Amino acid sequence: MLASLFSKPQSSLSAQAKHLVAMRFLIYTGFQTSYFIGVIGTLTYADDASVVATSLAVLFMNVFVILGSFAGGAALDAWGPRRHFLLSIVGALATGAAILVFGSATGIVLLGAVLLGFALGFAQPIATSYPAYLTDDPVELKDINSAIAMFSNVSIIVGPTLGGFVAAATSSRAVFVLMMIFTVLALVAGWGFRPQAGRVAARESDLAESGATASTASQSSNPSTFACVTFATSIKTVFTNSVLALLFCIIFLSNFGYGAFDPLESFFYRDVLHVGVEWMGWLSSASGVGAVLGAVAALTLAAAPGQP
């Protein structure tokens, strides 16, 4: 039954949408192989760092995810999805290579958390914004978004599980090699990704007409001015829409609670459960099971007859 549910979203997707789902799945799986084991695991097990260090890693990671998402959104608006995707690939590969080259000292790992967070945030529009470059049909958008959500949750299972096996066989830093492999696979999957020119033009037109200030900034030769206006427009859009504002608050509070425990989780594995760094991946992947089941259920409800 579960297999049939997994095949259901793909059967209704266009070829371009399938490319998009594969791109997101592969690049996000790469990130999932590396964050918990590669950053937090290295600090806890290899460096024997303190809770302060893991807390800083989580803080830096999440702050730069936000900054990266702002930068990624601005880059997408300015250059379109194909160039944005190539920049996301380059950023992920450069991050993995830098962490591998410069070693596992605590300061280097914290810098790695910064780079990884920015790269992850920069790539986030692949999931959130690319579907609108393929279609404006509400039903098709719902199918694409549901498939992306489901396979993103599959990444939460696959990534840490594979990362655990790599860490068990080699070291916690070796997971960044795995991240780079998945990034290259994402590039291969995205090679045939061709957003319709008309859709891209229409979206750029919508962005240009979203406000007089944004229009002026888009014509400006100063990229930083355009980026700042884009950020301000995005924030205004969220907080002037009650549904988006409520969704923002729900996501913020849920992640706030998760973030409070995140720096301590690795010490629980090491000092209470007395397991190796590989178990950080294997046990954390279990949280993805419920996420996948929830995404599949949402997809089933969306596909039910009579749904808007």
Task: Show which residues each predicted segment covers.
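Helix-loop boundary and gating motifs at the non-cytosolic
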Residues: 2-63, 243-287
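Helix-to-coil boundary motifs at intracellular loop junctions of multi-pass secondary transporters
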Residues: 45-47, 78, 130-138, 268-273, ...
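Symmetry-related core transmembrane helices of the 12-TM Major Facilitator Superfamily/SLC fold
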Residues: 174-192
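Juxtamembrane intracellular "pre-TM" segments in multi-pass secondary transporters
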Residues: 1-17, 195-248
